[in-house]
Amino acid sequence: MYKRQGINITNRNWGGGNLEGWDEVIDVNVKGAYNCALAALEVMRPQGEGTIITTSSKAGVNYSPRAGVAYGASKHAVMALNQLMNIEEGNNGIRACVLCPGEVETPILDHRPIPVPQEERERLIQSEDMGEIVVFIMKLPARVTLNEVIISPTYTRPLQPGEG
């Protein structure tokens, strides 16, 4: 199973945080990942095998000023869920991998405080790139688990004033 969930809020720093936005990010990014994993485990445990691939973010590995507080915290939580799944479910034949991409050209970029120019979007990770990585992971022998895959666009956008 491959699950990709993620939302963010426009006002991302500590000074402008709001509880409603925080709750929405946690509900979608963390609870969404948890609930999808639970549903998959109900099917995979009786089979004695399965692979769960979840998208977190590079913001779940290292803090990113662009990502902000709520998103970064939520993606760190997704990383922890994945680590715990491998510890608890590996002996049941279930493996979990978390993808940690940098900027991906998806609709979430439309909600950035400062829009990402189209010419820069084309240089970011594309959805097809993520798909190829998922296929690669699924083709690995069941005895192999990639716990985390960190993916970066070759092009690194400079941080703009007001982005972090």
Predicted region positions:
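Short, small-residue-biased leader/transition segments that mark boundaries at the very start
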Residues: M1-Y2
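Substrate-binding pocket helix/loop in short-chain dehydrogenase/reductase
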Residues: R12-W14, G21-D23
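Active-site loop-to-helix junction immediately N-terminal to the catalytic Tyr of the SDR YXXXK motif
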Residues: G17, S64-G72, L84
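Active-site helix of classical SDR
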Residues: A37, S74
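Residue(s) in the substrate-gating loop at a strand-loop-helix junction
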Residues: S57
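Active-site-adjacent segment of SDR/Rossmann-fold oxidoreductases
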Residues: N62, L84-I94
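C-terminal helical subdomain
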Residues: V98-L99, Q118-L159
